[in-house]
Structure formats: structure tokens, C-alpha cells
Amino acid sequence: MPSTNPFLTLPYEPAFASLGSEFSDPVEAATFPAHQLRFRNDRLLPILGLDPATVTDEHFIEAFGRFQGRSPLLAMRYHGYQFGIYNPDLGDGRGFLYGQVRGRNGWLYDFGTKGSGRTPYSRGGDGKLTLKGGVREVLASEFLQRLGVRTGRCLSLIETGEELWRGDEPSPTRSSVMVRFNRTHIRFGTFERLHYFKRADLVRQLLDHVIATYYSHLLGDPEADAKFYAELTERTADLAAQWMAAGFCHAVLNTDNLSIVGESFDYGPWAFLDRFDPKFTAAYFDHSGRYRYENQPGICQLNLELLQVPLGMVMSAADLEAGIAGFGDRYQATYSRLMLRRLGFEADQLHSAIADDLIITTLQLLLRAPIGYNEFFARLRAQFQPSWRSDLSAILPDWITTDLEALPEAQWQGWRDRYHQLLTHLPESQLPLIQQQLAQANPEIAPIRPVVESVWDPIAIDDNWEPLEALLNRWRHDGDGAADGVVVPNAN
């Protein structure tokens, strides 16, 4: 009898599987003692042409907890530079590619699992995901989506009834399995593995596949390879700028954790800045601070340079150098534009020198003021008044802190004067647009570590999921929300 599960009747495409056995290994999903759907991302279903009202929790569990009705399930092969050291012993260690489906927008999407059991690349691990790890990924990806950052999403999170032991969580801890919704799971490290085995033919095959599938606007262009790398550079620079403006620290920017389409994924010990600290390091095991917040743009550029090694098997050095040459300018332009939006302005409204001066002054203030990074922008959103344009004295410091003695006077006055200066450069008719921009760019609450714990503790102690759902709903509806499609030029 044909399945009535809408996930099992989707028109799956064997895009990655068609590359052949050199790129992946067929695996079996783990079986779990229990299945309880804890999160379902109904906002993604219309992209697949599905009506959330017709998709039941049991449909999610059957497809994404029991993994029935799909084969082959593919553990993808890749290598990578981990903390600067090449590691050839990598691959999908606790997940697999469940399937690929073309959305109504024409884009191909991956369903990729996390916590679905052992694979040939588990390296002695159990292949499982803690429930807290799953909740953390939901929080990170949904908040970044709310900010307009390009990111993979969590489609479902199912608690699976096992006790897991971890060194970085109080144990035993609860288990889960997640299905991610990403544009692709092809990484920089997917190419690096092929270079390791000296397979220029497979580099060529994979590059053709990536261009045809994710950069199809370049098909037929005699300079498609060079333009692909230049565009990947732009996308990666944009992504780094988005993270920095968001105050987001990915924590583990190894080459196997960077997507070939410039999308955030592989969330591990991520963190959002509480206070602004350029040297903040999110991962407890990053003892040298290699992947600290301020290093993220440079690490992204370095990883693009490392990608030149496998791509250099089929591309000229001149094309690769030309492609990466614009990284710095692209990053700075995107970062400036995004920071100005968080301050309520559009870059094309302002003289660049004045705008850049405001950004620098803002960061100098945040270094010393007793206020959180995202908290500052949320309070600016709440306190901004159109009267600030005509009356400098109306811009009072008490919205930053009531402890005015703790506020560095020189930094505060410098910021206030520059913000007022930008307001006077705009016509009065633009003031309502500033308020709208502040609301769209600055959610009222960010998932800094205390907020994450305030959501997790009720789950851990009382199995109370209401605080998580309340926070997610707040992001969905706060400031008119963000679109569920990712707006990136040429992101086909």
C-alpha cells in the first residue's frame, strides 16, 4: 500500500548519490527506544509544497525518527584542517544525507541528520546527539535566521529515550536525533579529501556538480570555474560579516565546517557575545583562541586560501588569486552595511566616512560600557525618538545604564554626537524608517548563554518546553520577523 506520509512521497532527487561511491558510504540508521517530537519547523514546510495542517507529528517521527522509507542513507566523506592541522580521518560521524528535495523556489535542499547513529567515521563515538545539543542548534539557527543571516535550519528534533555520557554536559543526559534543512552538506573539506588522494578527476566531477546544482547561473560560461570561486569568496565574506554584526562566534571554523555555498552550519559550542569582547572564545577546548570572535573573518579567508589547493588541480593559480582578492573589501562593505542597519540607517543614505566613524565609535563605546552587545541594539530600538534629530540633549545615557558613573563619559559623548550628526544628514521624513529599521534589525532578546540556560533548565528539570516555544515565537513575530527564504544574490 502506498505511503500517505507526505515526507516519504516527496520527489527526492539523487543529486549527490549520482556522484558515485567515491563520495559517500551507505549506512543504516540507529534504532531508538522512544520517539517524542520536541520541535517541528512548520515554517519550512511550505518551501517543500507541504501544508503544515496536513503533516502530523507521527509523519515527522516515521520519516525523521524511525527513518523508514528511504534508501540509500549516505554518510558523506570529507577531510579538513582542524585547528590548522590536516585530519584525513573525518566524515559524517553521527549523521547521514537522508535525501534531497527541490523546493518550490527551484533550489535543491538537503535533509541531513545529526545523532542518527554510528557510521564508518564515528571514530569510537556513539553517533548520538544530546537533547541539549539539539535545543542549542535550534536556538542558534532560528535566531540567526531572524537576523537575516544565511543559515541551515532544524526541520525536526526528536527525543529518543537514551542516556548519554558527555564530558561537556552533566551526565547522564538525554538523547535526541535532529534533521537539518540545508542547501548542501558539501564542505571545503569534501574537496580537500579528493586532493589528499590525488584525484583531480574527482575534483573536476565535484566542481561540475557544485556549479550545476548551486551556481547554475554560471552554466555555459567559459569562465564558470573562476566565477564560482569568486562568488564563493563573496558569499563567505558576507557570511563572516553577518556573524560579526550579529555578535556570533561559531567556535569551530575548521575547513570541514565551512559550506561550499556560504551557509552557516555544523553548530557546535557556538555562543553569542554577552559583553562586546573581540577576544571572546566560545569553545572551551580552543585554548589558543584560534577561532575567537575577532579572528573569524581572517579564518574564513584562510580557509578559502586552503581550498585553492584542491581547486588548483583543475583551475589556474591566476584565477584563484583573482577570485580571493576581493575578500577584504567585500567583507568590510557588508559588515558596514549590516552594522549601520543595526543602528537604524541604510548605507546608501550616508557618506561612507561619517558612517564608518559611527561604527567605530559604537564599538569603542561597547568595549567599555556596562551593557551587552545585542542588548545595546535592542535598547536603542526601544529608546529611539524622532526628537533626537532636532535636540541633541534629548539623547540621554540612561537607556544604556542607570549607573552613570560606570559609563565612560568620553565614549558616550562621542557616540551621541556622531549618532546625532547622522540623524541631521537625513530628511525628517526618514525618521519613521529608522524606527522600522531598528525593529527589523534588533530582536529584543538574544540567545546569550544565560538565556540558553533559562530555556534549557525547565526542560531538564521539569520537562517544560514552554519557555523554548515562547522564545521562538517571540523571534518569529518580533519586528515583523524575517523571511524564511534566505535572500542572497545568485543563491540558486
Curated annotation (Swiss-Prot):
It is an enzyme of class 2 (transferase). ATP binds at residues 91, 93-94, 114, 126-127, 180, 187, 266. GO terms for molecular function: AMPylase activity; ATP binding; magnesium ion binding. It holds the Pfam family SelO. Its EC number is 2.7.7.-, 2.7.7.108. InterPro entries: SelO (IPR003846). It catalyses: L-seryl-[protein] + ATP = 3-O-(5'-adenylyl)-L-seryl-[protein] + diphosphate; L-threonyl-[protein] + ATP = 3-O-(5'-adenylyl)-L-threonyl-[protein] + diphosphate; L-tyrosyl-[protein] + ATP = O-(5'-adenylyl)-L-tyrosyl-[protein] + diphosphate; L-histidyl-[protein] + UTP = N(tele)-(5'-uridylyl)-L-histidyl-[protein] + diphosphate. Keywords: ATP-binding, Magnesium, Manganese, Metal-binding, Nucleotide-binding, Nucleotidyltransferase, Transferase. Its cofactor is Mg(2+); Mn(2+). Coiled coil: none annotated. Mg(2+) binds at residues 257, 266. The keyword ATP-binding applies. The active site is at residue 256. Nucleotidyltransferase involved in the post-translational modification of proteins. It can catalyze the addition of adenosine monophosphate (AMP) or uridine monophosphate (UMP) to a protein, resulting in modifications known as AMPylation and UMPylation. NCBIfam families: PRK00029.1 (NF000658). Belongs to the SELO family. This is Protein nucleotidyltransferase YdiU. It comes from Synechococcus elongatus (strain ATCC 33912 / PCC 7942 / FACHB-805). The lineage of its organism: Bacteria, Bacillati, Cyanobacteriota, Cyanophyceae, Synechococcales. The gene is ydiU.
